[in-house]
């Protein structure tokens, strides 16, 4: 019994590290990661050269959210298409038991890597640009990244093409920007709840902190739930193997 449990544990650990290695070095993820880090370093250097530190809200978007969205888009675009191109998707569907276990492993590895990269960007921002609560920066940015990655994963299973999914996701993200701008122009609508990109550091000066925290909670809970829905529908699309093989 103990031997079986031990073998299962080491098998899962081996699979985990194998997936990390594939994500890092298969395709061009490591190139995107290096470019994202270079982008953050450039932002730090420019701030010191011009003696003009980036405002905290800009740090949230420019140094954390935008590069993370690009990395999340790339990873989720290649999650299914990489297996198709390398003719390994058949093996994933042929795993004894539920194939969802393998896909959930792959999604978990993807989000684990994205989380650690998000931590890296937050630490760079904290130590070299602005003081802020790191856990607030990471958690609020990562919820948005989680939702976008699952949206792109779902669209990849829908279109059977990572590039079509990536383009569609970019269109949707742009539409969400326009939607927020439109709702912000209507005084009777509280656009805070509908701002997909809401920053925790954008609190209006005259708003009570408890009310602001409540708005943030509702906003991020909604975004996280939508991300879970996209993940569910993406996994459901993978139930039918024929379109993917």
What are these regions (language model features)?
Residues 58-82:
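Long, hydrophobic alpha-helical segments
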Residues 99-132:
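Hydrophobic alpha-helical transmembrane segments that constitute the membrane-spanning cores
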Residues 78-111:
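Helix-loop-helix units of permease transmembrane domains in multi-pass membrane transporters
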Residues 38-45, 114-124, 171-181:
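Aromatic-anchored segments of alpha-helical transmembrane domains
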């Amino acid at each position: 019994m103990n031997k079986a449990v031990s073998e299962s544990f080491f098998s899962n650990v081996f699979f985990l590290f194998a997936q990390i290695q594939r994500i890092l070095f298969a395709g061009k993820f490591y190139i995107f990661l290096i470019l994202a880090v270079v982008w953050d370093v450039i932002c730090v250097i420019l701030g010191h050269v011009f003696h003009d530190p980036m405002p905290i809200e800009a740090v949230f978007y420019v140094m954390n959210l935008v590069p993370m969205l690009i990395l999340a888009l790339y990873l989720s675009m290649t999650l299914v298409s990489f297996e198709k191109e390398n003719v390994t998707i058949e093996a994933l569907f042929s795993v004894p038991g539920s194939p969802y276990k393998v896909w959930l492993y792959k999604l978990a590895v993807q989000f684990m890597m994205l989380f650690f990269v998000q931590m890296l960007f937050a630490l760079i921002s904290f130590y070299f640009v602005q003081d802020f609560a790191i856990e607030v920066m990471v958690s609020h940015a990562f919820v948005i990244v989680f939702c976008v990655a699952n949206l792109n994963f779902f669209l990849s299973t829908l279109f059977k093409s990572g590039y079509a999914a990536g383009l569609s996701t970019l269109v949707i993200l742009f539409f969400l920007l326009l939607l927020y701008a439109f709702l912000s122009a209507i005084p009777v609508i509280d656009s805070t709840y509908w701002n997909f990109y809401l920053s925790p550091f954008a609190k209006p000066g005259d708003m009570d902190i408890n009310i602001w925290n409540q708005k943030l909670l509702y906003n991020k809970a909604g975004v996280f739930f939508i991300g879970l829905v996209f993940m569910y529908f993406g996994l459901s699309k993978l139930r039918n193997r024929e379109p993917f093989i």
